[in-house]
Amino acid sequence: MALAFFPRGGSAQVARYLARFLPRSGWEASIACGSLGPPGAESNAASFYAGLDVHALDYTRAASAPDPLTAEPPFQPSFEDRAGAPDRVFAAVDDTVYERLVATWETQLADAGAGSADLLHLHHLTPIHEAAQRAFPGVPRIGHLHGTELLMLEAIDAGAPRGWDHAQAWAERLRRWARGCERLLVLSPDAVRRVPGRLGVEPERIVLAPNGFDPGRFDRRPLTGALRLEHWRRWLVEDPRGWDESGVPGSVAYSERDLAPFEGGGPVLVYVGRYTDVKRIPLLIRAHARARERFTSRTPLVLLGGFPGEWEGEHPLAVVRETGDADVFLAGWRGHGELAAGLNAADVLVLPSVREQFGAVLVEAMACGLPVIAVDAHGPAEIVDDGQTGWLVAPDDEDAMGEALVAAAAGDGAERSRRGEAAYAAARARYSWPALAAGLARVYEDVAAGRPPREGAGTLAHGA
């Protein structure tokens, strides 16, 4: 199993959980990946994938080099275009650097034992595919799309932005790599419909592979009353991780007086994720600020996440200052092992992202018994049953988001509880990692045995 990136986003979580649960179905997985930072950091591969067989490419020195892509080893490019970030967008990477990336990953795959593997499970569409094709042409490949590669490809097809000087070469590569995979795993029914036309692959090679949750970690363990207040005191006052425009964790901290919104017994709303443009955090903050006067009790909004120093567009703290909304809190980046505690100290998860290809945090929140508010598009539209497990709103509609916040916070909580119960049942019926890993093992067996894909898209949940 290989992915070019250091642990940061959802694809790393997927790789970690699959590698942990696949042995139950007879498959052992080694992980070749990127790494950043010292041992103990969440972005350090050995720490993040602790207990697994990990072969990591250390990007730490490259990240601070004058040109990270000419360092040794070269830093990872990105499917996202963020000004000033060390990981420049793939579409701006020239052929010389591309060849260096391929050569680097040929060596890394060899060190991880790719030559003796039954198959290669490659996350995203990156130069790892080219490295695998050149160095190990006889080992079958499974591609795993996580959505960001599709967003970059769609942007190229719509007319590449300025600075994407090598966009067409990368578009051709992504399509060629996809066509070279025996199967392509995608996150949602929406992707099942979009991918064949976008990448030029046969529909029968597509396998629906939703993200999941660990049932041993994510469950209903609600913190209420004094225990809830103590949790937020610890995360916001005693051990703050929020960060301002400096990017330094702890540069946003709160006092005991600031915790007043948590003391009245009103519901707590929580956002979990990165501070990227598609997440629409500024819209959420403004919707919350406008809804405050309509809440029947103080209803704090906690922003949990934001990889330190990484943001696009308006910084969330700047929007908080602009709106004067003292009930919005920046809790900063926490490890995935702490996420269940944060969810259980809240009442509703809110995800305003307009281009979310899946939305794993929705499933994790539902597995903790939380109803969710999300946008009626892409992955969330497939996960959330509007009116039953949560609320769906139109993309980029601040008014609709505000109405959903008011509805979720209203009354005595009976409606939240009803939808939370339905969310809990739905998550456990459809998105358990052990069951999804067992389904993936069946796909592995078909590919390793050279069986052709079956007619129509497969799915991990019901055998592929």
What would you call each of these model-derived segments?
Residues 190, 212:
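Carbohydrate-associated surface elements
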Residues 30-115:
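A conserved catalytic-core segment of Leloir-type glycosyltransferases
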Residues 371-374:
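Short hydrophobic beta-strand element within catalytic cores of glycosyltransferases
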Residues 386-387, 391-398, 407-413:
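Conserved acidic donor-binding segment of nucleotide-sugar-dependent glycosyltransferases
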Residues 354:
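Aromatic "clamp/platform" in nucleotide-sugar-dependent glycosyltransferases that forms part
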Residues 305, 313-337:
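Nucleotide-activated donor-binding/catalytic signature segment of Leloir-type glycosyltransferases, i.e.
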Residues 110, 164-184:
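Membrane-proximal helix-turn-helix segments that form the acceptor-binding/catalytic region
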Residues 185, 226-279, 285-288, 302:
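Conserved donor-binding/catalytic core segment of Leloir-type glycosyltransferases
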